[in-house]
UniProtKB/Swiss-Prot annotation:
Its cofactor is FAD. Cell wall formation. GO terms for molecular function: FAD binding; flavin adenine dinucleotide binding; UDP-N-acetylmuramate dehydrogenase activity. This is UDP-N-acetylenolpyruvoylglucosamine reductase. One of its GO terms (cellular component) is cytosol. Belongs to the MurB family. InterPro entries: FAD-bd_PCMH, FAD-bd_PCMH-like_sf, FAD-bd_PCMH_sub1, FAD-bd_PCMH_sub2, MurB, MurB_C, MurB_C_sf, Oxid_FAD_bind_N. The active site is at R166, C214, E283. It is an enzyme of class 1 (oxidoreductase). One of its GO terms (biological process) is cell division. Keywords: Cell cycle, Cell division, Cell shape, Cell wall biogenesis/degradation, Cytoplasm, FAD, Flavoprotein, NADP, Oxidoreductase, Peptidoglycan synthesis. Its EC number is 1.3.1.98. Pfam families: FAD_binding_4, MurB_C.
Length: 291
């Protein structure tokens, strides 16, 4: 069947290898993207050959099904960057967002210090408008290049894109994010701030276990983690999944968790908080076996 594709495709690739949860069955088809030109070829093909597909980066915000995915998984590994001016940098979407923040802050550039503790790709950060309480991706963003559903490369300035808390226009109108350009400022204190941010995250978050980061978006003016803590749910365990004792908004894989374990814990949290009149909305992407 892979012979029918005009590009190389693998079959039955375990998605647990591409998830920070370390959970997930095999992808029916799997394609690693390593250049924008390759991505253009793939999306042009998909425009005329409908096939269920998903795009993943580092899998840091995904929960795959134990059965895997019955379609094509596109793994974005398109990396690279270039300075367009002294304080503007264009970054390809498969690049590590955390490493980008670390490198730039160590070189005396401010604007993306918050990225040091966010374990996804640049494309994923734009898609989710990833951030912290201090800043988010859209703050420093000045341009995005995308490949639209018909396989055409487009350049979109920031002012034409509407972002909000953990929300981008690409969540409602899917497109492949090819690159992002950021505006930086020179600041010798940037490295110090980045170091403090990562130290705080290590102290407060369960990095020693596989997880997908924060499971829920924070309700306006509230902390989802604190709400879960006050509800007495920290430490609750089902199968190999557990609500972290370190941070209530993290569900961790203690070693042998399956998708059902994680979903059951998510449901328990939502139902418990709903009884208190609080609706928690998932930040993690739940990717089913079939779309």
């Amino acid at each position: 069947m892979t012979d029918s594709f005009p590009f190389s495709v693998q079959e039955s690739v375990p998605l647990s290898r591409f998830s920070t949860f370390r959970i997930g069955g095999p992808a029916r088809y799997f394609k690693e993207l390593t250049s924008v030109s390759e991505a253009l070829t793939v999306f042009s093909y998909l425009h005329t050959h409908p096939l269920p597909y998903i795009i993943i980066g580092k899998g840091s915000n995904c929960l795959f099904d134990d059965q895997g995915f019955d379609g094509l998984v596109l793994y974005n590994n398109i990396q690279g960057q270039e300075f367009l001016s002294d304080t503007q940098i264009k970054v390809l979407s498969g690049s590590s967002f955390a490493l980008l923040g670390k490198r730039l802050s160590s070189q005396g550039f401010s604007g993306l210090e918050f990225a040091v503790g966010i374990p996804g790709t640049v494309g994923g950060a734009v898609f989710m408008n990833a951030g912290t309480t201090l800043a988010n991706t859209a703050f420093s963003l000045i341009n995005v290049e995308i490949i639209d559903h018909s396989g055409i490369l487009l350049s979109i300035p920031r002012e034409k894109l509407l972002f909000s808390y953990r929300t981008s226009p690409f969540q409602k109108k899917p497109a492949f994010i090819a690159s992002a350009t950021f505006q930086l400022t020179k600041d010798p204190q940037a490295a110090k701030r980045a170091k403090a941010l990562i130290e705080e995250r290590i102290l407060k978050q369960p990095y020693e276990y596989p997880s997908a980061g924060c499971i829920f978006r924070n309700p306006e003016g509230l902390s989802a983690g604190a709400l879960i803590d006050r509800a007495g749910l920290k430490g609750l365990k089902i199968g190999g999944g557990q609500i972290s004792e370190k941070h209530g908004n993290f569900i961790i894989n203690t070693g042998n968790a399956c998708t059902a374990d994680i979903l059951e814990l998510i449901e328990i949290i939502q139902k418990t908080l709903k009884k208190q009149g609080i609706s928690l909305h998932k930040e993690v992407r739940i990717i089913p076996f079939r779309l």
